[in-house]
Amino acid sequence: MANNEYSDFALLSLNEDPKNLSGYDPYYLGWDRITSLSSTGVVGIHHPSGDVKKIATSFNLPANTTPYWRVNWSQTTNGFSVTEGGSSGSPLLTRNTHRVIGQLFGGSDINCNNPAADYAIYGQFHLSWDYGTNPQRRLKDWLDPNNTGAHS
């Protein structure tokens, strides 16, 4: 449907609703095109190369390095969690609203000796919204086709 390398997003249309498939119980995420974040931090959910779900947490605000959010992961009771290869396109969510604010673009090489130095780079959803010269290069035409000004 739409994609743009500027913020590294792709919007796909499914041929069938996963709710109608036996053995699937999908969970749909909301989105938010906010341009600045509160102090609650962020969460990355990913399935690296199709592996079981992983969750990475940051209690800090991501750095705004337009067109990307740069996220340094925080230590939790389970240690450090980082994004892994094969997780590209996975969502970045706010910790308070659990809405998508970015999509994974890349990050640092994993450093097991210094996990606090690991970071991830996410394309900013709000830039994916209207950065592009036609509907095939931006999200607003697909997620708000009536141009209501929706933010989430």
List the predicted regions and their residue ranges.
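Serine endopeptidase catalytic core focused on the charge-relay Asp
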Residues: 1-73, 85
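N-terminal hydrophobic or amphipathic segments with adjacent small-residue motifs
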Residues: 38, 44, 80-83, 96, ...
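Broad hydrophobic/π-residue packing in well-ordered secondary structure
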Residues: 47, 93, 104-106, 115
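Short, well-ordered loop/turn and helix-capping segments at boundaries between secondary-structure elements
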Residues: 50, 97-98, 106-109
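Extended hydrophobic-aromatic, low-complexity segments
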Residues: 52-56, 102, 111-113
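Short, well-ordered junction/capping motifs at the entry into regular secondary structure
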Residues: 74-80
